Design a protein with these regions (language model features):
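N-terminal ligand-binding lobe of clamshell/alpha-beta domains
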Residues: 1-124
Length: 124
C-alpha cells in the first residue's frame, strides 16, 4: 500500500498499521473517531482526548520535543505528524531511524476534511 502525504512524499506500508503513534492531539482524536484507536500505541502529553482512551497510552513527549528513543522503542509501523505542529528536524530524525512517517498539512477546512478522508484508508 502506498500513500502520498502532504509533503508529496510517498509512504509505502506493507500492511494496515498495527502500531500507530500520533504526535498531534487533533489527529489522535481523529484516529479514535475513525475506529483505529486500539492500534494507537503512543501519543504526546498534549493528547488528552478521548479522555478514557488516551490515559493508558504511552506518552512520548510533547509536540515540539518528542522523545525519539521512546518512539523508536514502541516499534511503530506508522507515525503521523503535522507540518506546523511538529518540528521538521524531528521529521528528519525519525526518518533517519527508518521509521515510517506520514506528514499532514491542512490549512483550510476543506483541506482538513480531505486529511480525514486520507487518514481513513491509511489506518485501515
Amino acid at each position: 500500500m502506498e500513500f502520498l502525504d502532504d509533503r508529496e512524499r510517498w509512504l509505502a506500508l506493507p500492511r494496515v498499521p498495527r502500531r500507530i503513534i500520533s504526535l498531534v492531539p487533533s489527529i489522535t482524536e481523529t484516529l479514535f473517531a475513525l475506529g483505529a484507536g486500539r492500534r494507537v500505541v503512543g501519543v504526546t502529553t498534549y493528547c488528552t482526548h478521548p479522555i478514557d482512551s488516551v490515559a493508558a497510552i504511552t506518552k512520548v513527549g510533547g509536540t515540539k520535543d518528542p522523545d525519539l528513543e521512546a518512539i523508536e522503542k514502541l516499534e511503530p509501523d506508522l507515525i503521523i505528524v503535522n507540518d506546523e505542529e511538529n518540528r521538521h528536524e524531528d521529521f528528519s530524525a525519525l526518518e533517519e531511524r527508518g521509521l515510517p512517517l506520514y506528514v499532514t498539512a491542512p490549512r483550510t477546512v476543506r483541506e482538513g476534511i480531505r486529511m480525514v478522508a486520507q487518514l481513513g484508508p491509511l489506518v485501515g
